[in-house]
Design a protein with these regions (language model features):
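Terminal intrinsically disordered/low-complexity segments used for targeting and assembly
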Residues: 2-8, 15-70, 228-273, 279
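A glycine-/polar-enriched beta->alpha junction
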Residues: 67-76, 83-98, 111-112, 125-142, ...
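Transmembrane beta-barrel strands of outer-membrane/channel proteins
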Residues: 102-108
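A short, acidic/glycine-rich surface segment
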Residues: 109-113, 249
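Residues that define the transmembrane beta-barrel architecture of outer-membrane proteins
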Residues: 116-120
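Periplasmic alpha-helical coiled-coil/stalk elements that build and connect Gram-negative outer-membrane
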Residues: 145, 152-268
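Acidic, proline/serine/threonine- and glycine-rich low-complexity intrinsically disordered segments
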Residues: 282-283
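Single conserved hydrophobic/aromatic residue that forms the stacking wall/gate
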Residues: 287-294
């Protein structure tokens, strides 16, 4: 009988050890001539590994990005998804720990005129589940996959948010530059109209020439108003990203913007492995395989 019990325990442990869930490893074999020649790995950091503060050095833009990371509703929702997945993962890890049960008891007994006797007991029992077929292990792997996927989603939302704020900011700088040029052009045409009218009064130009100059002047005025409207629309878009009321945002000048003078884009395969959507797809496949083995 004792021998049979030992044999049964040994079989159970062997089944639990081998498991039916194999670790997924993505294929990384790349043909040598895929990129038309030998790829040399450089020590310089790729663009995808740079911190956004190193790429965007404008203090006004950095301030806007920091505000967006604190107030944007999509990013906050992604943060909550990460916290939820982390709690699920912790629950899956705790399933491997033994469960303790505490059942305190007390009795009072008395015989005839003798003093009552009080008896107390504090039994503690421990139990745990043998993961014979890998169910608990697969659940833990699923929780890990969901946590990694939620983290990749958060990173993707964060990247899109930073890129959106930066793109909107530089659009404002570009429109500011165009507006400044248009206003200078407006002043130049205003002087041209005045000069042409003076020439007409002196008999050196006709009414047709004045009308042509005025038409060009009014056209430039219209472009100034159009640029001002575009700036208001872009500021509204920026306010939407920052989850705040639209306002006139303080900003720098396009001509003074500085970017890294030299950076590497990185090896294509490494760039793909750094993309949150690619990592999320790989994790989704891992989650699916874990679900199918249950």
């Amino acid at each position: 009988m004792k021998k049979n019990i030992i044999t049964l325990v040994a079989i159970s442990l062997s089944l639990s050890g081998c498991g039916i869930y194999t670790k997924y490893e993505p294929a990384t074999v790349v043909p040598d001539d895929l990129y038309g020649g030998e790829v040399v790995t450089e020590d310089t950091a790729g663009l995808g590994n740079m911190d956004w503060r190193e790429l965007f050095t404008d203090p006004y833009l950095q301030s806007l990005i920091e505000v967006g990371l604190q107030t944007n509703t999509d990013y906050q929702s992604a943060q909550l998804r990460v916290e939820e997945a982390q709690a699920v993962l912790m629950s899956a890890k705790l399933a491997f720990l033994p469960a303790f049960a505490l059942a305190p008891q007390g009795t009072v007994s008395s015989f005839d005129t003798q003093k009552a006797t009080q008896t107390y007991s504090l039994p503690v029992t421990a139990s745990w589940e043998l993961d014979v077929f890998g169910r608990m292990r697969n659940s833990k792997k699923q929780a890990k996959a969901l946590y990694a996927q939620s983290e990749d989603y958060r990173q993707a939302v964060r990247t899109q948010l930073i890129a959106g704020i930066a793109n909107t900011y530089y659009t404002l700088l570009m429109l500011d530059e165009q507006l400044d040029i248009s206003r200078q052009t407006e002043e130049a045409w205003k002087e041209t109209v005045a000069s042409t009218r003076a020439l007409m009064n002196a008999g050196l130009a006709n009414e047709s020439a004045v009308s042509q100059m005025e038409a060009a002047y009014y056209q430039v005025q219209g472009s100034v108003l159009d640029l001002q409207q575009q700036i208001n629309q872009v500021e509204n878009s920026l306010a939407l990203l920052l989850a705040e009321t639209p306002r006139n945002y303080e900003r720098g000048v396009l001509a003074k913007q500085q970017f890294p003078a030299d950076f590497s884009i990185g090896i294509p395969v490494q760039m793909l492995s750094s993309r949150p959507d690619v990592r999320s797809a790989a994790v989704s496949y891992t989650h699916l395989r874990a679900h199918e083995t249950e």
